[in-house]
């Protein structure tokens, strides 16, 4: 199976075109050769017509091309009529997506008024009880028939009204039926979506796209790769468009890094027709990050140099860290083998940050690049390595994007029968992140980039390679601020699931279903818990998708009703209807009860 033509050359996947709305009146065509489309979601209560109209207009004004609105009930779905009318009255014809969970009847109402209906195969026709049950083939076939009966009316109505569908699977909300047959796996996510796609095709309806969202970027990447490979297996006319997103990415740097790893990796491989960066922030921030991320992809992917070898040097459908020997390239520094992925810094960064770092700090440089015996190799040329115990990297100045260069390095080492540990770099042009083709033509000096762009580029490059299982140490040089460079390295490792040095938060982006102010609550929870290294806390705005979407979180804070919070351990609700004013401290109590609490240390000067 293959999900792209080559791991070394960017060639956009040729998807079929689907039409959303009337292109002559503000609608849009996605797929084919059309540019990748930016989508976001408003946070307003769907019954607040004026608020929904205003938020939508604000998004459109900054470049959002598709706007999603939640429709949790038939009443909410019916009010989409008024929202759409308000937008059209103001001359705004942006396509609207109705977000549906659990309620086929809400979907049937929404399809009357909006251009797209998003359904989640995990909960459109199935309930979620986390129940174990073995299905015979006959029982499974009967369940598929039941789903067909529930989903077919929507398909027929979409076809009649010339609407579009998004079949959007979420890792945290797979049905019990899928879980019991395929497990909590990328294969389960893909097969769940294909079941719904087959029903669409039974009725000769093809105006739909797929999404495969997960809060873990590695899982998300595997899912999309597997989906595209499975579509290829099904046949050439299964080339439906793909919507990319990392769900519950959170806010701030962490949300941007997770999204850049997941979305950026796939865009660099030529996948994706629409994208959304899901942040626990005001929706316009999502659009800004989408724009910035899309602008980096041509600079980070190889679309110029054809590389004859197209063999994958890693398994694209199953994450496994590349096997390397453990080595000690300098005194008191080990990497490779079973060691964690190490953080290396330049001598200049070391000299600036080490005076402010204590031995017990989790964020600290672990080696100086100039002190290591690193073999700098050009993977575009022949080379020899005499020992597996030599730490290697790609030489600066190689005229390839970093992702391509490091993948090619792994392929060449593999052909030589070598499995040397690899040090990853965020760029191949020295300190100051500036790809070769962007340098000034006159004096070849690098132009400093904005920190937000450095963050996205480093996350895409390093994160993509880590998701491939490549890398035993990393070096971030693109960020000129030494302290920020060090923090960025650790944040990328945590977002990629390679190291844990702080609390991990799985936080849904706010929407009309949210029962509390997510940004405020997230800040309060972080203030009390951000020192809990290795603990994962989910913060979910509502009960509709909360328990399932918490994925592998240790604890959950979920809106149960207006002003009331339910607390979870894993996916099990433990405390119910806690007043919101007490809920954060009750969460702390719950963490203490399960022996995951440690007292925070006194604040010290942070790295700068």
Model feature map: region roles:
Residues 63-68, 114-131, 268-284, 392, ...:
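Glycine-rich phosphate-binding active-site loops on the catalytic face of alpha/beta enzymes
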Residues 71-113, 351-355:
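N-terminal active-site wall of soluble small-molecule enzyme domains
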Residues 14, 33-51, 70, 95-103, ...:
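Active-site mouth loops of central-metabolism enzymes
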Residues 1-41, 46, 155-161, 299-302, ...:
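N-terminal amphipathic alpha-helix/helix-capping segment at the start of soluble metabolic enzymes
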């Amino acid at each position: 199976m293959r999900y792209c033509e080559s791991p070394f050359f960017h060639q956009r996947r040729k998807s079929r075109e689907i039409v959303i709305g009337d292109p002559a009146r503000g609608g849009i065509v996605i797929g084919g050769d059309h540019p990748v489309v930016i989508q976001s979601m408003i946070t307003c209560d769907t019954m607040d017509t004026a608020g929904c109209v205003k938020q939508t207009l604000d998004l459109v004004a900054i470049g959002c091309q598709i706007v999603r609105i939640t429709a949790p009930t038939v009443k909410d779905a019916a009010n989409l009529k008024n929202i759409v009318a308000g937008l059209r009255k103001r001359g705004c014809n942006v396509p609207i997506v109705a977000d549906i969970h659990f309620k086929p009847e809400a979907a049937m109402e929404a399809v009357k008024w909006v251009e797209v209906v998003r359904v989640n195969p995990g909960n459109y026709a199935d309930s979620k009880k986390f129940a174990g049950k073995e299905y015979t083939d006959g029982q499974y076939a009967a369940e598929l028939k039941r789903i067909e009966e529930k989903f077919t009316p929507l398909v027929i109505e979409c076809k009649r009204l010339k609407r579009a569908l998004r079949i959007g699977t979420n890792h945290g909300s797979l049905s019990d039926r899928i879980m019991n047959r395929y497990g909590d796996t990328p294969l389960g996510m893909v097969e769940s979506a294909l079941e719904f796609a087959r029903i669409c095709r039974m009725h000769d309806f093809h105006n739909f796209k797929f999404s495969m969202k997960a809060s873990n970027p590695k899982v998300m990447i595997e899912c999309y790769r597997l989906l595209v490979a499975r579509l290829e297996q099904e046949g050439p006319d299964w080339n439906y468009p793909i919507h990319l997103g990392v769900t519950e990415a959170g806010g701030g740097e962490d949300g941007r890094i997770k999204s850049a790893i997941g979305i950026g990796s796939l865009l660099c491989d030529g996948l994706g027709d629409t994208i959304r960066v899901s942040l626990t922030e005001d929706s316009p921030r999502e659009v800004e990050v989408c724009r910035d991320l899309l602008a980096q992809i041509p600079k980070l992917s190889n679309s110029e140099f054809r590389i004859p070898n197209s063999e994958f040097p890693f398994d694209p459908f199953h994450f496994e860290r590349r096997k390397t020997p453990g080595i000690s390239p300098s005194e008191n520094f080990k990497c490779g083998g079973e060691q964690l992925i190490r953080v290396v810094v330049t001598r200049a960064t070391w000299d600036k940050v080490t005076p402010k770092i204590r031995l017990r700090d989790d964020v600290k440089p672990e080696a100086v690049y100039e002190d290591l015996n690193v073999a700098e190799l050009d993977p575009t040329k022949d080379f020899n390595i005499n020992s597996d115990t030599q730490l290697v990297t790609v030489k600066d100045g190689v005229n390839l994007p970093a992702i391509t260069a490091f993948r090619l390095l792994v392929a060449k080492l593999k052909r030589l029968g070598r499995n040397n540990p690899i040090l990853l770099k965020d760029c191949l042009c020295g300190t100051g992140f500036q790809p070769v083709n962007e340098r000034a033509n006159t004096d070849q000096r690098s132009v400093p980039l904005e920190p937000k762009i450095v963050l996205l580029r480093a996350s895409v490059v390093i994160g993509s390679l880590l998701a491939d299982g490549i890398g035993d140490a990393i070096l971030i040089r693109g960020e000129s601020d030494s302290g920020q460079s060090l923090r960025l390295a650790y944040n990328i490792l945590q977002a990629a699931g390679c190291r844990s040095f702080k609390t991990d938060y799985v936080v849904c982006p706010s929407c009309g279903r949210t029962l509390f102010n997510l940004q405020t609550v997230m800040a309060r929870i972080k203030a009390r818990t951000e020192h809990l290294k290795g603990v994962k806390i989910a913060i979910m705005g509502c009960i509709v998708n909360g328990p399932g979407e918490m994925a592998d979180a240790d604890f959950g804070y979920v809106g149960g009703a207006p002003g009331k919070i339910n607390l979870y351990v894993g996916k099990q609700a433990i405390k119910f209807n806690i007043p919101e004013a007490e809920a954060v401290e009750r969460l702390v109590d719950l963490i203490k009860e399960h022996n995951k609490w440690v007292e925070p240390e006194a604040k010290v000067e942070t790295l700068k």
